[in-house]
């Protein structure tokens, strides 16, 4: 499905540098994890790799637009509690009353803010690997029922 890219915001969650040691020295490559969302229920994440940081970010954004999901919101929060595990990362999402704000840490916050959720309580358990935490959060949001 084609989306109007001007409506979406991008947040770079993580940029990593990978080193390969070869006979002639070290070769660096970069990875980028990007989350895109329109604050109206659509969100996606993407992963890009390249020899240069801007190229890795561009690839990650393109990948994010291929992985967009539609999240069912209940006003400014979610409809029910949900707990999801992705690899060693575990995410707990709880609906919150209006005015609470987004209480989330690390890589969970950009995903929830770009979806358009304004009031939610979260807890990240287990591994805090940003890639797995983002994937667990997206998985949890896709499993929500209204």
UniProtKB/Swiss-Prot annotation:
Entry GO CC: small ribosomal subunit
Sorted alphabetically, which Pfam families does this protein's record hold?
A: Ribosomal_S5, Ribosomal_S5_C
Q: Does the keyword Nucleus apply?
A: no
List S-S links within the chain: none
Show the SUPFAM superfamilies listed in the entry.
dsRNA-binding domain-like, Ribosomal protein S5 domain 2-like
Domain S5 DRBM: from-to ranges: 8-71
| Protein's UniProt keywords contain RNA-binding | yes
One GO biological process term is: translation
Q: Which UniProt keywords apply?
A: Ribonucleoprotein, Ribosomal protein, RNA-binding, rRNA-binding
Molecular-function GO terms, alphabetical: rRNA binding; structural constituent of ribosome
Q: What PANTHER family would the database entry show?
A: MITOCHONDRIAL RIBOSOMAL PROTEIN S5
Q: Describe the subunit structure.
A: Part of the 30S ribosomal subunit. Contacts proteins S4 and S8.
Q: What is the annotated role of this protein in its UniProt record?
A: With S4 and S12 plays an important role in translational accuracy. Located at the back of the 30S subunit body where it stabilizes the conformation of the head with respect to the body.
Q: What is known of its domains?
A: The N-terminal domain interacts with the head of the 30S subunit; the C-terminal domain interacts with the body and contacts protein S4. The interaction surface between S4 and S5 is involved in control of translational fidelity.
User: Per the similarity annotation, which family is this?
Assistant: Belongs to the universal ribosomal protein uS5 family.
Q: What is this protein called?
A: Small ribosomal subunit protein uS5
């Amino acid at each position: 499905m084609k989306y109007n890219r001007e409506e979406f915001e991008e947040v770079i969650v993580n940029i990593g540098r990978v080193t390969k040691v070869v006979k002639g020295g070290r070769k660096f490559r970069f990875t980028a994890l990007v989350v895109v969302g329109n604050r109206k229920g659509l969100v996606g994440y993407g992963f890009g790799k390249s020899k240069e940081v801007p190229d890795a970010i561009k690839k990650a954004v393109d990948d994010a637009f291929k992985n967009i999901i539609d999240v069912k919101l209940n006003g400014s929060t979610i409809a029910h509690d949900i707990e999801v595990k992705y690899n060693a990362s575990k995410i707990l999402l709880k609906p919150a009353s209006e005015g609470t704000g987004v209480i989330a840490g690390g890589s969970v916050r950009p995903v929830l803010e770009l979806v358009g959720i304004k009031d939610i309580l979260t807890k990240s358990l287990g591994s805090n690997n940003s890639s797995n935490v983002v994937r667990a959060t997206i998985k949890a949001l896709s499993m929500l029922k209204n």
